[in-house]
């Protein structure tokens, strides 16, 4: 794709691609501002809007990580080695997400529907009745467009968990698929909840070097 980006816009774009490659999700405005030395997130917002107008990203309103790559850039952000395995996700009580790629699985994104963007390692048994077990790799499609009852990867207070999503008004319940675990109730007026993606498949026992 032909792009006429300014030097600063190119730096912002490169940081977005780097972050998505390393973490599996886009940066926030504050993270862009901090990394590139902007005085405030508003400066990052201006550059993001310029990139959106030039067609190299698409901004999704209503979420702090609402940045999507378009066309060739999206393909370039996907490793040719397969799907990246990103950190760990608590399937019990939430744990801090590991912000690094452990390895890659030799599996095409289009193996899953919708296509997977990365794999997250599951720890714990809170989702066992949905067939998601300790040590599995959960295939995740990056999106904030979800419906009640779907299994999501949610980030709550900088921690990540896999749960079934239910919402009523300002309240969200992150519901386990194990009677031993109580639902996590979130008041969106007072707590910061971000949906990192939708669970689209499971690789059983993904702790080894290959797929099982």
From Swiss-Prot:
Its EC number is 3.4.21.88. GO terms for biological process: DNA repair; DNA replication; negative regulation of DNA-templated transcription; proteolysis; SOS response. The active site is at residues 126, 163. InterPro entries: LexA, LexA-like, LexA/Signal_pep-like_sf, LexA_DNA-bd_dom, LexA_repressor, Peptidase_S24_LexA, Peptidase_S24_S26A/B/C, WH-like_DNA-bd_sf. It catalyses: Hydrolysis of Ala-|-Gly bond in repressor LexA. It comes from the Bacteria. Residues 29-49 bind DNA. The keyword Transcription regulation applies. Keywords: Autocatalytic cleavage, DNA damage, DNA repair, DNA replication, DNA-binding, Hydrolase, Repressor, SOS response, Transcription, Transcription regulation. GO terms for molecular function: DNA binding; serine-type endopeptidase activity. Represses a number of genes involved in the response to DNA damage (SOS response), including recA and lexA. In the presence of single-stranded DNA, RecA interacts with LexA causing an autocatalytic cleavage which disrupts the DNA-binding part of LexA, leading to derepression of the SOS regulon and eventually DNA repair. Belongs to the peptidase S24 family. Homodimer. This is LexA repressor.
């Amino acid at each position: 794709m032909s792009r006429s980006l300014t030097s600063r816009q190119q730096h912002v774009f490169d940081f977005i691609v780097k972050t998505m490659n390393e973490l599996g999700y886009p940066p926030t405005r504050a993270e862009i501002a901090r990394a590139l030395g902007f005085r405030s997130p508003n400066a990052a917002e201006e550059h993001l809007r310029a990139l959106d107008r030039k067609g190299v990203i698409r901004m999704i309103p209503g979420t702090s990580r609402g940045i999507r790559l378009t066309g060739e850039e999206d393909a370039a952000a996907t490793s040719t080695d397969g799907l990246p395995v990103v950190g760990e996700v608590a399937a019990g009580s939430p744990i801090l997400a590991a912000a690094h790629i452990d390895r890659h699985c030799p599996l095409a994104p289009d193996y899953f529907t919708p296509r997977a963007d990365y794999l997250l390692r599951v720890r714990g048994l809170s989702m066992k009745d949905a067939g998601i077990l300790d040590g599995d790799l959960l295939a995740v499609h990056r999106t904030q467009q979800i419906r009640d009852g779907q299994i999501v990867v949610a980030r709550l207070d900088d921690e990540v968990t896999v749960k079934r999503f239910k919402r009523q008004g300002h309240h969200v319940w992150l519901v386990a698929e194990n009677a031993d675990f109580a639902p996590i109730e979130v008041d969106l007026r007072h707590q910061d909840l971000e949906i990192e993606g939708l669970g689209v498949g499971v690789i059983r026992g993904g702790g080894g070097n290959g797929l099982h």
